[in-house]
Amino acid sequence: MPSSPLRVAVVCSSNQNRSMEAHNILSKRGFSVRSFGTGTHVKLPGPAPDKPNVYDFKTTYDQMYNDLLRKDKELYTQNGILHMLDRNKRIKPRPERFQNCKDLFDLILTCEERVYDQVVEDLNSREQETCQPVHVVNVDIQDNHEEATLGAFLICELCQCIQHTEDMENEIDELLQEFEEKSGRAFLHTVCFY
């Protein structure tokens, strides 16, 4: 088992549902975890598919919660958005954008291919300083509450297995292959350097 704990980041588009569900479960299991979004804005479902609620990443979960409570308490209670924001504000004050974080991680898990591409592109555009490797793995998770929960448990199980490897660099590919077979999902994987 590695001497230092695995530093994990979970990234989705708006740092609301998928990454926060995984953040919640991983932190309860004792992982050193942070979560992020890669979007230019935070988007939450609105009264119609073409009318999302759009916020700046500086907006707190509490402010979003109160805004939606004021707009339509019944709608946002019924569709689970208020419940989700309530959970989020217990974890951290506001969503964070991956591109603004300069912390180093051992493992970055993304929740969809577009986000994976954005994370890899961002890491590759940074100036390499330490040459420390970071594994970026994509686990496709649909953006709804049920799939976010299932995906979070899968991510947690994957992190626990990686945490217990003797040699992450040499064992991760085999581990991901086992997870693909077990879960029926395909994982994208690449290594970037800090």
From Swiss-Prot:
Broad EC category: hydrolase
Record's GO cellular component, any one? cytosol
Instruction: List the GO biological process terms.
Output: co-transcriptional mRNA 3'-end processing, cleavage and polyadenylation pathway; termination of RNA polymerase II transcription
| EC code(s) of this entry | 3.1.3.16
Q: Which GO terms describe its molecular function?
A: RNA polymerase II CTD heptapeptide repeat phosphatase activity
Catalysis performed (reactions): O-phospho-L-seryl-[protein] + H2O = L-seryl-[protein] + phosphate; O-phospho-L-threonyl-[protein] + H2O = L-threonyl-[protein] + phosphate
Cellular location of this protein? Nucleus; Cytoplasm
Q: Which residue windows are coiled coil?
A: 160-187
Per the record's keyword annotation, is Membrane included, yes or no? no
Name the InterPro entries for this protein: RNA_pol_II_suA
Q: Which UniProt keywords apply?
A: Coiled coil, Cytoplasm, Hydrolase, mRNA processing, Nucleus, Protein phosphatase
- Please report which protein family the annotation says this sequence is part of: Belongs to the SSU72 phosphatase family.
Report the function annotation for this chain: Protein phosphatase that catalyzes the dephosphorylation of the C-terminal domain of RNA polymerase II. Plays a role in RNA processing and termination. Plays a role in pre-mRNA polyadenylation via its interaction with SYMPK.
Quaternary data: Interacts with GTF2B (via C-terminus); this interaction is inhibited by SYMPK. Interacts with RB1. Interacts with CD226. Interacts with SYMPK.
Report what the protein is called. Answer: RNA polymerase II subunit A C-terminal domain phosphatase SSU72
Q: Which organism is it from?
A: Rattus norvegicus (Rat)
Instruction: Name the gene behind this protein.
Output: Ssu72
